[in-house]
Amino acid sequence: MRLFKNWAKTFGENTDINPNSEMLVSNFKNFLSEQNNPESIDLSSFEFHDELDQDFWNQPDDKLDPEIREKLLVIANDFWSSLEVGDAEYDDITFTGSLAAHNYSRFSDVDLHILVDFSDVDDKTDLVREYFNAMKSVWNRLHDILIKGYEVEIYVQDVNDPHEAQGLYSVLNNEWIKKPVLDKQDF
């Protein structure tokens, strides 16, 4: 998503670009080198925090902020209603990733997972996975949703797939599935 947003800045608004042009190739190489230059990365924001991000987890027992929870539910339900999944229903909506743990940074995003039994959608679960991946890619590209300055990224996960995470929060049930524990040796 971030690379997509930087495209116009690098290549301009011209939609009549010849993909074989030397200018395009040269600009693209420059673009990639800027995006992947290790010296240009500020690592100072990658640090351990003694507490969770208080913009999100400011309630007793580190519960999710009620306004943020409501926004995440609206986002997930809006996405879900845009899909063609028949009578299939999701099992849970979860918040995971670095913002649900102690290793968040200014580069974090809100990882919003919708858990579904893919076989409830269709017996061809590989096709279901491809469909969900395509739809979430389009959705994430078309919707520039920020919460507290962090980009919201939707992902549809099969309930039968294992999910490794330091922190995993059920937005639907408003409770921790796996509350993160600060252990600096994990990083």
Range-by-range predicted roles:
Residues 4-13, 19-22, 26-34:
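Proteolytic processing junctions in secreted/extracellular precursors
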